[in-house]
Amino acid sequence: MVTIGNAHEDLIHDAVLDYYGKRLATCSSDKTIKIYDIEGTENYKLTATLTGHEGPIWQVAWAHPKFGSILASCSYDGKVLIWKEQQDTQQWSIIAEHTIHQASVNSVSWAPHELGAVLLCTSSDGKVSVVDFNDDGTTSHVIFDAHAIGVNSASWAPFTAASSTSSKDANTLKQHRRFVTCGSDNLVKIWKYDTALETYAEEAKLEGHTDWVRDVAWSPSNLVRPYIATASQDCTVLIWTQDKDGKWQSQPLTEEKFPDVCWRCSWSLSGNILAVSGGDNKVTLWKENLQGKWESAGEVELIK
């Protein structure tokens, strides 16, 4: 395990490895992003410090390497910045700025690469925006109302084998765009692209939490059935599954509530392990047993 000390001058809000697990991007309330090369299991090297935001930076997201060394970031300043590293100079620069939100942008998430270079953004203004980075260098976006008093996070549905058998033209691929959002209205919503309306339509509304839903994560594996995890300020994590009739059902991850607010939830790449972090400063791991119940799979030891 690599431990990086004194990385930022203020709270660190996100830390994300790239596709290959060789580079780490971190972001902080100090308004900077730092890029590290990870060398083995113990060594690291700071290679860049990126400045451009005017407020705390909440989240960063690496694009798939097929699009190059590209990073998206979002901030309290209401901006989404797209950064690109020039391979010859290894210098980072801002190549796009997304400024259509009227409040803090709380999360950014790249679509499955099969769907193209598409970025999903959520904001405290209650809206969600989806930005397309087109092959000709232009961008286009759709923005719509999602959660009246603020959207906290979003997660794309995985690109399925059934999707991949259809045509690869842009309009057909748009039909396979599907994602889930969560908000300060205690709700979780699933959205799908509507080709007739040319925007995203609400497919389902999931009710189960009694306080703000802070994070949502769609499992990257749909081999058995879809799984969505939601973490809430009500100190619970819910696991949502879809039955054969298309209805969504939820079950609590644990019988007892967590000791504090649940901030984040994240699936392993294989989709069988769920990590949960909360206000108790712990990261716990969970796995579904053969009876369909969720049980502890350990705890990540944090350096204090």
From Swiss-Prot:
Assembly: The COPII coat is composed of at least 5 proteins: the SEC23/24 complex, the SEC13/31 complex, and the protein SAR1. Component of the nuclear pore complex (NPC). NPC constitutes the exclusive means of nucleocytoplasmic transport. NPCs allow the passive diffusion of ions and small molecules and the active, nuclear transport receptor-mediated bidirectional transport of macromolecules such as proteins, RNAs, ribonucleoparticles (RNPs), and ribosomal subunits across the nuclear envelope. Due to its 8-fold rotational symmetry, all subunits are present with 8 copies or multiples thereof.
Stated name of the protein: Protein transport protein SEC13
Function: Component of the coat protein complex II (COPII) which promotes the formation of transport vesicles from the endoplasmic reticulum (ER). The coat has two main functions, the physical deformation of the endoplasmic reticulum membrane into vesicles and the selection of cargo molecules. It also functions as a component of the nuclear pore complex (NPC). NPC components, collectively referred to as nucleoporins (NUPs), can play the role of both NPC structural components and of docking or interaction partners for transiently associated nuclear transport factors.
Any one annotated GO CC term: endoplasmic reticulum membrane
Keywords of the record: Cytoplasmic vesicle, Endoplasmic reticulum, ER-Golgi transport, Membrane, mRNA transport, Nuclear pore complex, Nucleus, Protein transport, Repeat, Translocation, Transport, WD repeat
InterPro entries: Sec13/Seh1_fam, WD40/YVTN_repeat-like_dom_sf, WD40_repeat_dom_sf, WD40_rpt
WD repeats: 7-46, 52-93, 100-141, 146-201, 208-250, 257-296
Subcellular location, record wording: Cytoplasmic vesicle, COPII-coated vesicle membrane; Endoplasmic reticulum membrane; Nucleus, Nuclear pore complex
GO MF term list: structural molecule activity
Membrane topology, from the record: Peripheral membrane protein
Organism in which the protein naturally occurs: Lodderomyces elongisporus (strain ATCC 11503 / CBS 2605 / JCM 1781 / NBRC 1676 / NRRL YB-4239) (Yeast)
GO biological process, one term: mRNA transport
Entry similarity comment: Belongs to the WD repeat SEC13 family.
Membrane recorded as keyword: yes
Pfam families on file: WD40
Gene name of this polypeptide: SEC13
